[in-house]
Amino acid sequence: MAAERSFIAIKPDGVQRGLVGEILGRFERKGFKLVGLKQLTPSRELAEQHYGVHKERPFFGGLVDFITSGPVVAMVWEGDGVITSARKMIGATKPLEAEPGTIRGDLAINIGRNVIHGSDAPETAEFEIGLWFNPSELSDWTPSDQTWRVEG
């Protein structure tokens, strides 16, 4: 059985504030495996597809403007329960409601600048990974310390 994968993106505010290493480190220390990584400034088309579920919401235009305003670090992380675990690590969408110890709880204040995005379900992860990455951009590899990360 293939391990679960999740799409995680460090938004322009996180990149501009120099938080990439801090965030990557949290996922690595948790024991998840990085299988895709790139930095890009998203096109408007990509942003509109990514946030398509919010198209009719009043904040849609501002959200698209923000995510296309600078570089984003797009990642695919793999591991048992990575989607649920990543959401817990990220914290509540509204940073002031996020628990201390979460990425947003520690590193963000405002909902419009909440540093990071993470897939919320397997179907969403599959869609987002396919939107942001070509299959050839994902690495299938085994960390040398794999037996120390997970059983079996």
UniProtKB/Swiss-Prot annotation:
EC number(s) from the headed UniProt entry: 2.7.4.6
Alphabetical UniProt keywords: ATP-binding, Cytoplasm, Kinase, Magnesium, Metal-binding, Nucleotide metabolism, Nucleotide-binding, Phosphoprotein, Transferase
Family: Belongs to the NDK family.
Pathway where it operates: Purine metabolism
Function of the protein: Major role in the synthesis of nucleoside triphosphates other than ATP. The ATP gamma phosphate is transferred to the NDP beta phosphate via a ping-pong mechanism, using a phosphorylated active-site intermediate.
Official protein name in the record: Nucleoside diphosphate kinase
Residues reported to bind ATP: K11, F59, R87, T93, R104, N114
Biological process according to GO: CTP biosynthetic process; GTP biosynthetic process; UTP biosynthetic process
Reactions accelerated catalytically: dZDP + ATP = dZTP + ADP; a 2'-deoxyribonucleoside 5'-diphosphate + ATP = a 2'-deoxyribonucleoside 5'-triphosphate + ADP; a ribonucleoside 5'-diphosphate + ATP = a ribonucleoside 5'-triphosphate + ADP
Catalytic residues in the record: H117 (pros-phosphohistidine intermediate)
Enzyme type, top EC level: transferase
Principal subcellular localisation of the protein: cytoplasm
Subunit and interaction comment: Homotetramer.
HAMAP family assigned to the protein according to its UniProt record, in alphabetical order: NDP_kinase
Entry's transmembrane regions: none
